[in-house]
Amino acid sequence: VEAEDLILCGGAVGSPQLLLLSGVGPADHLQDMGITLHHELPGVGQNLRDHPNVRIPVRVREDFPLDSEAPRTQLALRYTAAGSSDRNDMQILQSSFSSPMGGDPLEGEGIRFTCIIELAMGAGELKLTSTDPQVQPDLNYRYLEEPWDRERLREGVRLCLKLLEHPKYQDFVEDCISPTPKDLESDDDLDQWLLRNVTTTQHISGTCKMGPDSDPMAVVDQY
């Protein structure tokens, strides 16, 4: 390859994994793994960012057309959470077909909303589980550890349920599969539901953070 600038990147999982296996990263973690430290760089594998989301599946009437091969998501609602200083920090997706989590993707259970935090305060970390590069590292997302993330996601779920009360939805919606009325009795109950159901949007980033020399957690700079 001939070019002025070459960027070697293994993605948000592969890049920190490769650096750690090469002895570049947090000294204590490398010592725990029995890897010789060549360059201490504490930010490697830290600052794991994602867009935490929860799915709200909804049961529909039998005459509603559920087509597993049709475009499922063609509409998105971007909005700013109440009290947020970050514009459009939340997103709600509506899908015309929903399959059970972890089940057959072609098995229809109804429609669904997906409520997403676009700029979460919380961050996780990536750590090695083996010195074998073929072994998947451990991804600890630490979802919803920050109270502000839980507050915004609670608001998003309640907004989805409010949308379902609109007459246009009531024309074909039977009921909400999850969360249940019991899950909605209090903020604490809803928080427990969130923690049981929060998952990845598969938008991982940040594990080799870019920043200036003054940032001790920066891994690379703009050059």
Label every PLM stretch briefly.
Residues R61-P65, R72-Y223:
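FAD-dependent oxidoreductase catalytic-site/capping-region signature
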